[in-house]
């Protein structure tokens, strides 16, 4: 008979008034790669309780060979599933910092709210902020590469496959207008008429 002992270390980062949860970190093996995932809205899962989404995230992250996962959301406001809040610079800051230290970043808020103006606004804010990390940005898909951009609760992607994601697939990237240095105009040289040498 053999006994295996494993520890699931959990950190939950909240706002001072506990109205927002910025990140939920789960660590079970720090020798393995780190995953970050961005979902829709922060739920009730915390340091002890696990909701179904968190269970699916942990199980699939471990199955794919990761040793930790940082769970974040477009809206950090607890249970803000209708997305009433669209401005949260602190949430954007946390998402970017977690993405920088992750090996892969999964963007997975789902498509159910894709016509919601606040969803569109939040998605744009987050994805534009993640452009420096675009080389490690992915979304969920099924085994055939279809059903992209689904939330982990979608039956089509409850067994994860990861597909590379470009920011430009979901948001319009503003044109970067570079100010070209003005060319220095050289003053024209005045040409004096040559005097003819009189013949001797």
Label every PLM stretch briefly.
Residues 42-44, 76, 112:
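Short, glycine/serine-rich, charged loops/turns that create anion-binding
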Residues 34, 67-68, 104, 136:
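Residues at the starts of beta-strands that form the adenosine-phosphate
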Residues 54-62:
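Short catalytic helix/loop segments, enriched in acidic residues and glycine
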Residues 1-51, 192-200:
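Active-site and ligand/interface coordination hotspots across diverse enzymes
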Residues 66-82:
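Short connector loops at secondary-structure junctions
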Residues 79, 84-200:
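Glycine/proline-rich loop-helix segments at beta-alpha junctions forming the active-site rim
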Residues 48-53, 86-90:
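Glycine-rich anion/phosphate-binding loops
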